[in-house]
Amino acid sequence: MKLTTKMPKGERIVSEIKKKIEEGTLQEGDRVSTVREMTKLFDTSVSVVQNALQSLVKDKYLECKGKSGYYVRKQAAKKAVETAAEEQTEQNKPIPFIVIHHNDLVWRRNFDEYDEIRRKQIKLELEMSRKDPRFTFGIEQSAVLERYAEQEPGDVKYLQQLIDEGRLEPSGAFSIQDLNLVSGEAILMCHLHGKKYYKEVWGCDTPVASLTDAFGLCSQIPQILALSGFQYLIPGRLNNRDQKALPFPADGVFRWIGLDGTPIYVTAREGRYTGHGIGREGGSVVNTDNVTRVTNMLADAQNDPSDYIMIYTTEEALIIENLSEIMDNLNRKAARKIAYQNAKTYFEAAEKENIPQVYGEFNPTLTGCYTTRISVKMDNRKAENQIFEAELLDLYRKGKSKDFTPVWKQLYLIGFHDAICGCHTDHANEQIREKLDYVLKETAPAKANLKDGTFTVFAMNQKNGIQLASAPVPPAGIPSQKDGDAYLFEFDGAFTVKKYQTAKKKPAAAKKCSAKFETDYYKVNFSNGIARIENKNGKNVFGNDFGELVLRPEYGTMWQEEYKGAKIVRRDDTEEKLVSCEEGPVFFKVVTEGFIKDGLPEIGNIDNHWPGFESLSFRKEYIFPKHADHFKLKLTVDFHGRNTKTYINFPTTVDCHTAHPLYQVPFGSMERKPYFEIPSNETDSAQFLAHQSDYESAKGDWPALNWVDYSDGNGGLTVANNGTPSHQLKSGNIMVALLRSGTRILDGNLMPEVGSFENGIHEYEFAFQAHQTQDVTKAEQLGQLVNHPARVIAETLPEGDVLSFSQENVAISAIRKSENGILVRVYETQGRYASISMSGSLLKGKTVFNAEADGTVLEKENAAELNFKPFEIRTFILK
């Protein structure tokens, strides 16, 4: 039975009369309809009409003059008109309206195909702007405008005219990157590039950033945008938002406070878009006519008194050519008008005092993206690492400095959200791989000349204490040990250079040893092929079966996980054996190999264990330095099949009820509680996502960059990686996602292709460090160690510390040449105020200046006293 609710007739009479008074249809002294007339008009009884009229008399809207009838009171008419005028002023405020295509640079088509799509879109917008001098449109990435100007140089003059008039609004960075999977330095550089291009080429200093469709917003985005010169943001997904501070829907703008306290003004209604597609009303009425769809959405907007900017967007389609005609027709019928306006004007006029304030991040969402096509993410990390080292070493190369701008531009394209997330076609992936190959080639380390019997090692990481350096030849005078094609030896010094003589004799080969051994820091036992590890200092933080592989059936899309059934493959379904255990003068090396045993399809009806899974084998190579406070694991996995998600599990003894799960984020770290599949007795360890719809796109994982750390009051464990961002720190376990291969269709009706399943061999590297107290600086150092190990360099550098700080809570993000000197960018890692001195050979003969993020020199600084706010990003120029 369908239930309907109607307003009682007496209330309806009151409402209608009040409305006519407020609209001015009934003026002061006017007589309202008679009781008899109203009984017919409203189809009701005399008593209902009389009660309604008496109610209006009581509220001082009407006065009764006996047999003459009821009349509008003077005070009521005046008050109603004033109130209505105030409301009319707000409600009649024009709706700012702009056309901004969301231009995917790569996704279900490749880069070249999207170039042509955008060319046609912008051509049409230029035609429409010539026909209608009001028409206003925007471009959300500088890569789009830059490419179009190359394609259509004849339009450049007119583009400039539109920009000068405010009818074409450039906004945002070079590209809209994924803000969880690329480094903070890459995000900042990408925004600086976009800002610089708009300013230098078009004379446009846009204050509006655009991150539409970004898969989550990390907590340092406000500071990054502010450092790049942006004041306002058109956001992407605002997932897991604080519902009290920012309910959905919310109007106007809100103030987003980042990790360091920097604010940015953001449009609140991320859903305020109109576009094409299939519009459904209650699942029954379907509208596929884009003209009708856009018309109806704009008409609906005219009935909404809220303060917002309306954005008409498509991805690949052309916009409706008669848009201005539709708008004019609607404006003739409605009190609230729609008016073309750019986002800057909207933001500048928006209320900014009594507005919501939101802190932190907008994560997680589309968590499958953290693992899909893992090789793209791992090679992007490698490319970021190499460009950091290449720019640093370029300071010491002879001759003309290398221009890294073309390399950075390709890296921005790789970091585009639909590229690095892996959710694209195999055809698109080919071009992404080409760009990765280009960046890796252009930043590859120069080959050192070893013929003179000497070599130089540079530890481009801030790890204090002993670490292992590698060289293609053994050093003289100190112990070394061969591992593959390299010789490993102890190196002590953070961001330090040392020179070595080449040994005349190769060291003796490592010898077979017991599977049970000790280093200065760890007790290790591989007697049955399964890792049993204990730290020797303080409470043991290692759990049993360290490095266990965990597989589960996963039938999601490339973006979203979807788990079917409870079948999980773990140790009981795994065959693993000890292959070798060796000892040399520098380290112990343990190798195990194994595979997932065949099993019946308990979940589903075909294949091995479940539909889609075929096989997985693996090899683990552990390196335990004898005198270092950490150890490493090289994991090789050979996977075949689909519909499978693979983790490696590092169990700990951390008490999940009092634990602090920390994840490195761009330019900082955040504590994030588990939120999915929480055991019923551990709900006190969890957080719950703000809205049930958040769970549709998030299934347990959180993103991290170089490291995660899991600790309680008695100690903890840091795990560093070389490009595997997807983690779960839950129930005392550190789970790292290695591979996933969902087969379901989602956005763009993309059928996941064979390439997205990543069948074949994959290599991963991890490092581990137990600790007794939570210390983010040690985690930061371990993450740097994995990604920038001490190695031989071809360049000539003075021995000693290149750059050092008096405290450990400052991390180096970049060292490169700039127009004004040497740019050094660092950030505070522990979330505390600090006064720190900076020293090292890099500063020799140079003065330190505070600088803008783009290298613009500001005031002189005292290198002996550099002040940092919590999580502050600072840029210095040395000259």
What are these regions (language model features)?
Residues 122-142, 149-170, 245-297, 518-519, ...:
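Active-site cores of enzymes that catalyze phosphoryl transfer or operate on phosphate-rich substrates
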Residues 54-89:
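HTH-adjacent hinge/linker in prokaryotic transcriptional regulators
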Residues 97-108, 112-113, 260-453, 599, ...:
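Catalytic grooves of carbohydrate-active enzymes
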Residues 221-224, 238-240, 250-252, 268, ...:
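C-terminal (or distal) subdomains of carbohydrate-active enzymes
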Residues 85-182, 186-189, 198-200, 227, ...:
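N-terminal catalytic cores of secreted or lumenal carbohydrate-active enzymes
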Residues 158-171, 177-356, 647-649:
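Catalytic-core regions of glycoside hydrolase
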Residues 1-47, 51-54, 78-83:
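Extreme N-terminal segment that seeds HTH/winged-HTH DNA-binding domains in transcriptional regulators
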